[in-house]
Amino acid sequence: GGLFQPISREGALVLNNLILTVSAATVLIGTLYPLLLETLTDEKISVGPPFFNLTFGFLMAPLLLAVPFGPMLAWKRGDLLAALQRLYLAAGLALVAGLVLFYAENGGPVLAVVGLAMAFFLIFGALADLWFRAGFGKQTASIAWSRLKGLPRSAFGTSLAHMGLGITVLGIVAVTTFETETVVEMKPGMTAEAGGFVLTFDGMRAGQGPNYTEDRGHFTIRKAGVAVADVWSSKRLYTARRMPTTEAGIVTFGLSQLYVSLGDPMADGGLVVRIWWKPWILCIWLGTVVMMAGGVVSLSDRRLRVGVPKRRAKVVAPVPGQVAEAAE
């Protein structure tokens, strides 16, 4: 309770909640506005990715930039300059890591470097918070390590949550920037490239499931001429409802995934094949798990445990006869 300065940990929390509220309202308005407009005027419009990317992205960028500063600020009155001095190394490392990943993925839009650097800044900023809390660089390694182990669980929970956010942002930016889609007509023996891999179409095979029939396509995946994986993709027909579906084949390489989907057959005997390369996509889900773990660790802090009040013992009123006998 009490008053606090804008530059403080309380101020950072207020800024966090304000930006999240405005961002949520923006998404809600963009989702419901077409429905409301159609109900009132019968006019149909579409609100798609351009609107959400322009508004939500620009709203979240300041928040992502401010997140590492929050734990560095003191309660009531913080020192922004001191926080900057503690985070400049993390910012430099984040920029270098962003550039390395950008060029490792063969480039892309220049703004992608900003997004990647911001993601790494969240990760390195969370580690920097633990580093300075433990006193590394000011104390001997043994003392700093002891202090690190003695930090409250809420400190580790906060760092985990911020690292998880950075990992999720890394996955979102990487997929948005470096994702490739290849649509090609293939016949058995033909090849296609995606994500540095060469896929060879080996042919089709009929299959039977418990309640469907399917045509399965087999692909061999090679890297530098060496077979590293294979994948099946199929088109199914559920016999009861006569409902066709396409089952994409998915292969995971580290934190990236390759999707292979069968399209329509062509008149010349070929088959349309769609191949998606989604680099770092698993970071989106990994970051979510890390954020959840951070919340669990924070809630397990002994300082946040609420004690159960002990029941008062019932006092039994003495019987008058027993009191008289005791007095005698």
Task: Describe every region a protein language model picked out.
Residues G1-E328:
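Solvent-exposed, non-transmembrane regions of integral membrane proteins
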